[in-house]
Design a protein with these regions (language model features):
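Substrate-positioning beta->alpha
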Residues: 99, 132, 149-169, 176
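Mid/C-terminal beta-alpha module of Rossmann-like enzyme folds, strongest
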Residues: 164-231, 248, 253, 263-279
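A conserved pocket-lining segment of Rossmann-fold NAD(P)-dependent short-chain dehydrogenase/reductase
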Residues: 85-88, 135-156, 160
Length: 279
């Protein structure tokens, strides 16, 4: 958030073939405005971009999000765009990622080779930050998940995203954006796969979205008192109900991007959580 904090990181970049991967950010499903999310996702990106230009960095790969992309009418698959506007997307997180992506791409006019990747719902092992799908897996395995909700989303393995980012560094084209998605999966299917992987009891209660939406404000307040991130908020329920599909055909074609089966991701996540003593 402070330009001065980047000086040591960028020291000595001048005159060298340097590529910066900007993947710092806060993933938030909060329904209310959060200054910290804005400061990190938008102001932080501006500071990194400005430092790249100032220090003569050759290449910047900006890790955006599929949330920065406007939805298509009728649930049509979402593909890449080169126009980003906070007004075209819903929710604080999406708006911050759209604003940050627009600023990063505009730096091409200042001589910076900018490329953008848009991961979908990142999941997988090695999640020390307690991401939302990891929390769902953990709650299922420990018997704390009493009910699921209708809806679904596109989930992608963090290891496939990492490989896609490196491929973008090497094979991506300046000024281009690449969706790094996985596959669409309903919450019901996620829970069924976890049952098969772990042998734990099934979650048989699935809340309709209208009921989950009605309870979301109380849920957010409850988890705020516990100082824990809620699994479901008004914004996350909007996302689960959107039915959004994302095409990674461009990344597959130009970057050689591939994804592993989602069941493998869940099994590896469960195994890692066990090794960590979290389940």
């Amino acid at each position: 958030r402070s330009p001065a904090s980047l000086e040591a990181l960028f020291a000595g970049a001048e005159g060298r073939d340097v590529t910066v991967i900007h993947c710092a950010g806060i993933v938030s499903i909060a329904s209310r405005f959060d200054q910290n999310v804005y400061d990190v996702n938008v102001t932080g990106t501006k500071n990194v971009v400005d430092a790249c230009v100032r220090r003569g960095v050759k290449k910047l790969v900006h890790v955006s999000s599929v949330h920065a992309l406007p939805e298509k009418p009728g649930g049509a698959p979402v593909s890449e765009t080169d126009v980003f506007s906070p007004g075209a997307v819903v929710g604080l997180y999406a708006k911050t990622k759209a604003a940050a992506t627009a600023y990063a791409l505009a730096a091409r006019a200042r001589g910076l080779d900018v490329r953008v990747v848009h991961p979908s719902g990142i999941c997988g092992p090695y999640d020390y930050g307690h991401g939302h799908l990891t929390q769902l897996v953990q709650d299922f395995c420990t018997g704390r998940l009493a009910a699921g909700v209708d809806g679904g989303y596109d989930f992608v393995d963090v290891r496939d995203v990492a490989a896609g980012i490196l491929a973008c560094c090497e094979r991506g084209r300046p000024g281009e954006c690449y969706i790094l998605s996985g596959r669409y999966c309903t919450v019901r299917d996620v829970l069924a796969m976890l049952h098969r992987i772990t042998g734990r009891r099934r979650v048989r209660v699935m809340l309709p979205l209208w009921l989950a939406r009605a309870a979301a404000p109380l849920s957010e307040q409850y988890y705020r008192l516990l100082r824990q991130p809620p699994l479901y908020t008004a914004y996350s329920l909007y996302t689960l109900s959107s039915g959004a599909r994302f095409s990674h055909a461009k990344a597959a074609r130009e970057l050689g991007y591939t994804t592993r089966p989602f069941g493998t991701t869940l099994a590896d996540t469960v195994a890692w959580l066990r090794r960590q003593g979290r389940i």
